[in-house]
């Protein structure tokens, strides 16, 4: 599949920086995937059904997208699709067989650890698949089959639209494995509409106000449960990458196993509270944090008395990770601006990690 890139979109087009531009492009990327990626998604779903052992790999943001996928395959298709960080996979790939399927996620398609892991999988005869934004990249050329992210160039070092594109592909693929691709496509379209509404000035002003509350924080914690747990990890990564605030994501159920010792008076705590089976437990966790002085920033469709601040998201069911990403992206972005950071070029980071 050839991707036609509109070169007029390579510039800033009136945006102050690439991060804000690429965050704003997320709805149209999701709509493009629904319109064009169906055949590749069906092929990947068929390969997953035919495999005996399927494994997903990614590094950084791509790893959290892949981890989200492991939850989606379980919830939607009742299928166990394993996840591993790309940099660790080579240390326990000994169980791979020619019946295995290894799916790598990468924006650039050039990540050194991913390429090394895929070469190891190929040496064991396993089938290779790639979900990639650069079809002519090393990963794009080495795999047996590919799903193109169709996100267009991503210039900011931080990945925003490629992340939501990966999660959208996974949501649709999980439905395709189950034989319900159209249901997955409809969920992605609902999420795209929700994101477009969230990009309105009234909502972004709310995020900017919350960013002003956290800009001087030394530490920040993000919690989620179930499908929102990988989102919490990605949210913490985005915030720390761009704002340089020490942010950590945790499974909410792990709070009492050590994490809560770090919470002090005024510690910002971002709490993902979707309308799903995790809601009651996540609110209980928020209360535990607040009782120890935590400043609770709730993200979800409904407010709650425990929240000190609330960033509303649309209720889109299993597409929740697609709308949950934007609040953290934008929170990190505005905190970075308030702290005088360049959001497009965070210190010590490169767009493509081509060395180990």
Give the positions of each predicted feature.
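Active-site phosphate/pyrophosphate-binding segments
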Residues: 5, 11-55, 145-268, 309, ...
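Glycine-rich phosphate-binding loops that contact phosphosugars or nucleotide phosphates
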Residues: 46-196, 225, 272-318, 331, ...
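Internal helix-turn-beta structural module
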Residues: 315-343
């Amino acid at each position: 599949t050839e991707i036609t890139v509109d070169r007029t979109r390579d510039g800033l087009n009136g945006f102050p920086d690439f991060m804000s531009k690429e965050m704003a492009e997320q709805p149209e990327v999701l709509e493009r995937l629904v319109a064009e990626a169906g055949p590749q998604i069906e092929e990947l779903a068929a390969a997953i059904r035919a495999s005996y052992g399927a494994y997903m790999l990614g590094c950084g943001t791509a790893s959290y997208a892949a981890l989200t996928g492991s939850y989606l395959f379980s919830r939607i298709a009742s299928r166990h699709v394993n996840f591993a960080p790309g940099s660790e996979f080579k240390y326990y790939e000994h169980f791979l067989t020619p019946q295995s399927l290894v799916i790598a996620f990468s924006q650039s398609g050039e990540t050194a650890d991913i390429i090394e892991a895929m070469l190891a999988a190929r040496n064991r005869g396993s089938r290779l698949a790639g979900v990639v934004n650069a079809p002519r990249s090393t990963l794009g050329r080495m795999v047996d089959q590919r799903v193109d992210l169709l996100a267009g160039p991503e210039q900011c070092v931080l990945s925003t639209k490629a992340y939501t594109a990966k999660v959208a592909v996974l949501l649709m693929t999980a439905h395709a494995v189950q034989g319900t691709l159209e249901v997955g496509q409809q969920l992605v379209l609902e999420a795209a509409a929700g994101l477009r509404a969230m990009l309105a000035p009234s909502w972004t002003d709310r995020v900017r106000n919350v960013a002003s509350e956290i800009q001087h924080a030394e530490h920040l914690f993000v919690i989620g449960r179930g499908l929102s747990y990988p989102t919490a990890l990605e949210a913490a990564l985005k915030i720390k990458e761009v704002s340089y605030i020490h942010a950590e994501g945790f499974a909410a159920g792990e709070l009492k196993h050590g994490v809560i010792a770090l919470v002090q008076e005024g510690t910002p705590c971002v709490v993902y509270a979707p309308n799903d089976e995790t809601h009651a437990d996540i609110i209980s966790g928020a209360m535990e944090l607040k009782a120890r002085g935590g400043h609770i920033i709730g993200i979800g469709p409904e407010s709650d008395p425990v929240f000190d601040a609330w960033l509303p998201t649309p209720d889109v069911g299993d597409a929740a990770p697609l709308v949950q990403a934007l609040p953290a992206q934008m929170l990190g972005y505005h905190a970075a601006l308030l702290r005088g950071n360049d959001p497009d070029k965070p210190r010590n980071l490169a767009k493509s990690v081509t060395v180990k």
